[in-house]
Design a protein with these regions (language model features):
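N-terminal export leaders
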Residues: 1-7, 15-18, 25-27
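Predominantly soluble domains enriched in secretory-pathway, periplasmic, or organellar proteins
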Residues: 18-406
């Protein structure tokens, strides 16, 4: 699969949806946004408990642990699902808000779930939604589907004091909202690019990175102390959050604009140097230095459209291949397992998948099958990262985001 130029217009028209305007596939009826004050609402407790999320070990030689639980963001519903990772036991769903997308779990066991209605807070030990923080950004009526407004990517500061959520504004540029995790208040709103699929944080917490799909860019933000916020200049480094720079990430160029498939989706932050790794089409891996805005492009081998990323504790990069843009030239869905030295293994997957999370011991990848376009399924594929063997775990409702709980 070679892309010296963009694919022919006919192919783009037939398949355009990865980044274009809303289409008929998003047939879910819109919902009316609930009225209420600009403060978090709460939900009634749910019975049941699960293990608290803990820091990951540093290597992949850790002895086998007790079975984990997966926390799935059910993009096709208004729930998160607790799914036993060993395939035993019954899934447990908790209502969080319409069309949840991204999920991040802190060391205190609280999960932060980006929904169309607000940033939901779930106690993973009691399995209850304890709050939902409304966005300050106006996103229109609450809806479902690929282009719905509301939260997408979400991440936590290393000290757990702030949550960062990328908010999509249909037909416009998005925002990054900063939430104080103690007071459950939005403390700053900053402008970012269109459709902020992914939010990542530097290992030391000194920078936040927002990958905006529709505008081919990464916004680099100095989170400061998490209060207020500005578009450029001033504050930062302990003051108000500010935008440091915007970096175009387009190894194939930006021709085609919203109709192009060749956009960034998700990034992974390499702990050794803080660089962002952004995969494209199973051919090119952009290695971006966010401190300078400079990047290098490295070769990949899966030859398929790519979305979700994750890093294992020992530094292997996992990349989800959703399937071909052009079936005549491209390969099918897959999981790329890329070693720190750049060598790759490609594990075929059954049908499109969206995102991935690794087990803390680095032995297993959990890949969600709730793709944002057609072809999605209700479940997760577990991949043994040593043997490449796969195992299907049914559960969730069009799950997109995933976190591993112990």
């Amino acid at each position: 699969m070679r892309r010296r130029v963009l694919l022919a217009a006919a192919v783009l028209v037939a398949l355009a949806g990865c980044a274009g305007p809303p289409s008929a596939e998003d047939g879910d009826p819109p919902r009316t946004a609930p009225a209420g004050p600009g403060r978090p609402d709460t939900a009634a407790p749910r019975p049941g408990r699960t293990g608290e999320a803990k820091p990951s070990p540093t290597g992949s030689t850790t002895p086998a642990r007790s079975p984990a639980t997966l926390l799935l963001a059910d993009f096709g519903a208004d729930t998160v699902t607790f799914l036993p990772a060993d395939g035993r036991g019954r899934p447990d769903a908790v209502r969080v808000g319409a069309a949840p997308y991204g999920v991040a779990v802190g060391a205190d066991g609280r999960a932060w779930v980006a929904t169309a209605e607000g940033l939901a807070v779930v106690d993973t030990r009691t399995r209850e939604r304890v709050a939902r923080v409304p966005y300050r950004t106006r996103t229109g009526p609450v809806a479902h589907g690929e282009y719905r407004g509301g939260g997408m990517g979400v991440a936590l500061a290393p000290d757990g004091r702030h949550a960062y959520v990328g908010v999509n504004v249909p037909d416009g540029r998005g925002t990054l909202e900063v939430v104080d995790t103690r007071t459950l208040r939005v403390t700053a709103v900053l402008p970012v690019g269109r459709r902020p699929f992914d939010v990542d944080v530097a290992p030391d917490g000194g920078r936040v990175y927002v990958t905006a799909h529709d505008s081919f860019e990464v916004t680099v933000i100095d989170p400061g102390d998490g209060e207020r916020g500005s578009d450029a200049g001033g504050a930062g480094e302990g003051g108000a959050p500010r935008v440091v720079r915007r970096v175009e990430v387009a190894p194939y160029g930006t021709e085609g604009g919203l109709g192009s498939w060749l956009k960034p989706h998700y990034a992974a932050v390499r702990p050794s140097d803080g660089h962002l790794l952004l995969p494209f089409e199973g051919e090119r891996l952009v290695d971006l230095d966010p401190a300078t805005g400079r990047s290098r492009v490295r070769r990949m081998t899966a030859h398929t459209h790519q979305h979700g990323t994750a890093l294992t504790p020992d530094g292997h990069l996992l990349v989800v291949g959703t399937g071909p843009i052009d079936p005549a030239e491209d390969e099918g869905p897959s999981l790329t397992i890329r070693a720190p030295d750049g060598t790759e293994r490609v594990v075929p997957l059954d049908g499109p998948h969206e995102n991935v999370s690794a087990s803390p011991d680095g032995r297993t990848a959990y890949v969600t099958a709730g793709y944002t376009r057609e072809g999605w399924r209700d479940g997760v594929t577990a991949v043994d990262l040593r043997t490449g063997k796969t195992r299907w775990l049914p559960g969730g409702t069009r799950p997109v985001g995933v976190a591993v709980l112990e």
